């Protein structure tokens, strides 16, 4: 269906990681591409140039290993989520979201469930993704990170947009009283 096809264009990273505990890191990353490959080969006869499942699996594994390298976890490919720190689990979740090469990558408070010491490693990975061709939507309370990475900031209050603009406009010169009150709690 069209909805199913559209889902492949979005990568989602949640605050609680949502990794499958029974799967290794590499299998968590490869799961969605395996399902997509199976369906695409059935419909079109190929997946990323591969004409059969065996060749598709090689491509998917190479991609997953490359993504693990990108997030700094190459050595953890055969580990299980329970053996990873929260920051490592979140980086695996990011690699998993990237595995289908989405057009839009959505992050829901990607650091809120992490110890403060682990926040930096996850933010650095997200920061490195800014140069990719994907659009990123990041829900965050990490004001300095938002200032550094965002092209546009939307401040929401009570489920509606209170203010939007460049980081300079919204963070340094907020016009809305709700935005001003929120930002006054941070040293920026």
Task: Mark where each language-model region is.
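ABC ATPase "signature
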Residues: 164-165
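Conserved ABC ATPase signature
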Residues: 80-84, 88
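Catalytic Walker B motif of ABC-type/P-loop ATPase nucleotide-binding domains
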Residues: 105-108
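Conserved signature/switch motifs of ABC ATPase nucleotide-binding domains
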Residues: 79, 100, 132
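ABC ATPase NBD coupling module
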Residues: 1-11, 53-58, 131, 170-174
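A short, surface-exposed alpha-helical micro-motif characterized by mixed small hydrophobic
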Residues: 146-148
């Amino acid at each position: 269906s069209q909805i199913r096809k559209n889902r492949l264009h979005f990568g989602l990273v949640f605050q609680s990681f949502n990794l499958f505990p029974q799967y290794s890191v590499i299998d968590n990353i490869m799961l969605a591409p395996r399902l997509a490959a199976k369906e695409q080969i059935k419909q079109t006869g190929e997946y990323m140039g591969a004409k059969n499942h065996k060749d598709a699996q090689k491509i998917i594994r190479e991609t997953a290993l490359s993504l693990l390298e990108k997030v700094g976890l190459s050595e953890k490919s055969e580990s299980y989520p329970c053996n990873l720190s929260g920051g490592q689990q979140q980086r695996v979740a990011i690699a998993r979201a990237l595995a289908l090469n989405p057009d839009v990558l959505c992050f829901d408070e990607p650091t809120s469930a992490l110890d403060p010491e682990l926040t930096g490693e996850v933010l650095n990975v997200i920061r490195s993704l800014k140069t990719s061709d994907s659009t990123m939507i990041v829900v965050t309370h990490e004001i300095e990170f938002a200032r550094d990475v965002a092209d546009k900031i939307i401040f929401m209050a009570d489920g509606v947009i209170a203010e939007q603009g460049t980081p300079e406009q919204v963070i340094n010169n907020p016009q809305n009283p709700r935005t001003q009150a929120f930002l006054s709690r941070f040293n920026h």
